[in-house]
Amino acid sequence: MDCEWEGRPQRAGSRASQDPEGLPEARDDGLSESFLLLQMDVEYDPQEKRRPANSAAWSSKNVQRKQRHWERIVSSKKSKRKQERERRKIKRAEDLGNGTCPQHSKRFLKALTKEKLLEAKHSGPRLCVDLSMTQHMSKKELSRLAGQIRRLYGSNKKASRPFWIYLTGFSTDSPLYEECLRMNDGFSAYVLDVTEEDCFSLFPLETLVYLTPDSEHPLEDIDLSTVYIIGGLVDESIQKKVTFQKAQEYSVKTARLPIQEHMIRCQNEKNFHSEILAINQVFDILSAYLETRDWPEALKKGVSPGKGYILQNSVE
């Protein structure tokens, strides 16, 4: 009886160690759990219904799907660009109809400025910057002169009636040229003439007028047949009559800006009065006069209060 009772639990235990389908339980064998998982994968793969039997074909369809998506994006961008072009076209037409100035691209404005400057070469007034006196200038003075050249050119580009500019006595291997390249962005593309030739040999002497503050003759008008010369000289030691003596050496006519005729000295803390101007300031006065034909108005733009002069009519 005792033996029979002990045997029955063993048979029951044997039955309990099997699942309904007769598979061994995981605790009986270490591989049984892996077998169950493998069986589940074999019985059901969620990708199986979507993936073609041929994996290469499935990959090809995936590439085609991405290609179609990319083509839709490209087509959408093209459509938006076309709509934007149409919008700008309508806007330009409306601006012209309303008499307002249309907005132009930077490239268009740059080309327009270049064309205007080139026209001045054939029909505009001529201005020569004499750069033959830079050999004794310090690095600081050369830097200041390079900055003045940049500002002069910038003013000429904006002028309604630009001058044609000559930079004479200007060697491309000189320290000043290197300083201009360093300080002035796009200097090599400036629309002007650069030459090593001296201004006195480049033009007939009778067509030249050297602008110098030491001249006895005030400049009365700007003549298109005359070449006006500005001395490209920055001298912190203030050597007097350098440009005047150079003009006399070549028997060239001289003139000064009519500061004395239209301005008077004013009291200042340092009791300082000077008619010596930077080359870009001289140019601004000439350019303003060419546009307005009004010396007081032109002088007001170029002669700063620090020079110790004010317009006569401002006192009256």
UniProtKB/Swiss-Prot annotation:
Biased composition (Basic and acidic residues): 83-95
Gene Ontology MF: a single term: tRNA binding
Xref: InterPro entries: MT_TRM10-typ (IPR028564), MT_TRM10-typ_sf (IPR038459), Trm10_B_MTase_dom (IPR047911), tRNA_m1G_MeTrfase_euk (IPR007356), tRNA_MeTrfase_TRMD/TRM10 (IPR016009)
GO biological process, one term: tRNA N1-guanine methylation
Any single Pfam family the record assigns to this protein: tRNA_m1G_MT
Transmembrane segments: none
Assigned keywords, A-Z: Coiled coil, Methyltransferase, S-adenosyl-L-methionine, Transferase
GO cellular component terms attached to this protein's record: cytosol; mitochondrial inner membrane; nucleoplasm; nucleus; TIM22 mitochondrial import inner membrane insertion complex
The UniProt record lists the keyword Methyltransferase: yes
Record PROSITE patterns: SAM_MT_TRM10
Keyword Hydrolase: no
Catalysis: reaction(s): guanosine(9) in tRNA + S-adenosyl-L-methionine = N(1)-methylguanosine(9) in tRNA + S-adenosyl-L-homocysteine + H(+)
Skewed-composition ranges (Basic residues): 63-82
Disulfide bond sites: none
Residue segments, region Disordered: 1-30, 42-98
Family in the record: Belongs to the class IV-like SAM-binding methyltransferase superfamily. TRM10 family.
Its biological purpose: S-adenosyl-L-methionine-dependent guanine N(1)-methyltransferase that catalyzes the formation of N(1)-methylguanine at position 9 (m1G9) in tRNAs. Probably not able to catalyze formation of N(1)-methyladenine at position 9 (m1A9) in tRNAs.
Descriptive protein name: tRNA methyltransferase 10 homolog B
Species, as recorded: Rattus norvegicus
